[in-house]
């Protein structure tokens, strides 16, 4: 290459928009980030302003370029990764949203989900979209907008409105309304996409009263969708060449492109994805079936499980229990004791996610004796994150019949060496922590870079996936099984609480 070229990842998250610029060696050379407003109109409702999402995201790219003096004509391509499921409906003639973006966390469509369950659609949804009937996904959010925004249904029927997840909205804005597109990973989170036939599901569209004319074209996660001159001087055109939802982008950034490879992102919650290749695995253990990326960005199947409380349980120790000054101190205190002294902490503050899906379970500390101190509770809380991860991975291995070779990890909590070592012990599996932990942005950049020839092959990318550290399991089998049995008993206590509560009433 005669002149230094770069690739950009736009990472549009739930609380902030970021731009990450990478060089050919996949080193991060510039990052810019802007937070935006969280809107809570009613209890359980969460919204964003789509124009603010666009304004913050476009300005981060300009800022990231300005920080390093990189010119726009040095950009080989742009990849986009985004908060999934968040739903935007806009008028294609005016370019204006008809309502705020309804965010993935928003629970306002619970009644619509109940109505669809009453119509006997649960099995159809699971078999054809891979998902469960839940307000989390986009479909019921679109229906809510059409049902509740004045004039929206009429405009939709007249072909004036477009739907998109955040990636679709950004590409539409970046191309001045020329391109209305999404990728397979984002489409698979809408509850409107048939993951068997890889097309929009007409039955689901009909059941929700959503005109097919609103839906974007669905493409691979690595191809040129259109050109933009965002942040460019003198009309420099830059190809938009990669799109993936945030968790699937992280899976790709971790180079989990073959069947049986899995990653866990330790954030507020934990998101586990396992690539199952070209085989669609329907879960019997409370997991979602979704679409991820194969080696060249082509659609591949994956299993997904979400743990509601990961790093958030450490924040609870800090903010509510006040037994930690900072989350980063948890490793120090956890290693001041040799064991948790028989204590288990089940952080079911908002119920339990996969594989239990128990909305009524509540947080529980069991096994307390007089000898238990705050260090034991801190250690047990960290252990609880690792046990929940094993719960999901056991379900994935049972569903897929694939034995996990290793677990690749990312997210804030992976800096905690105690947690990573305990995770390895509990799973009896190697845990691989990468040197670059910005794997979501990496995934989007890799997908775009492959599409424009910035990188030539997946092999070239795998050479760049340098590990910071490999954690190997130390525990003997008897000890591991005894501990895990104790965890399972503790989970039963968390689940029994609501049943006992009902008996008292």
UniProtKB/Swiss-Prot annotation:
Belongs to the FGGY kinase family. Its EC number is 2.7.1.30. Key enzyme in the regulation of glycerol uptake and metabolism. Catalyzes the phosphorylation of glycerol to yield sn-glycerol 3-phosphate. Gene3D superfamilies: 3.30.420.40. One of its GO terms (cellular component) is cytosol. The lineage of its organism: Bacteria, Pseudomonadati, Pseudomonadota, Gammaproteobacteria, Vibrionales. One of its GO terms (biological process) is glycerol-3-phosphate metabolic process. Pfam families: FGGY_C (PF02782), FGGY_N (PF00370). Glycerol binds at residues 84-85, 136, 246-247. Pathway: Polyol metabolism; glycerol degradation via glycerol kinase pathway; sn-glycerol 3-phosphate from glycerol: step 1/1. It catalyses: glycerol + ATP = sn-glycerol 3-phosphate + ADP + H(+). It comes from Vibrio campbellii (strain ATCC BAA-1116). ADP binds at residues 14, 18, 268, 311, 412, 416. This is Glycerol kinase. Sn-glycerol 3-phosphate binds at residues 14, 84-85, 136, 246. One of its GO terms (molecular function) is ATP binding.
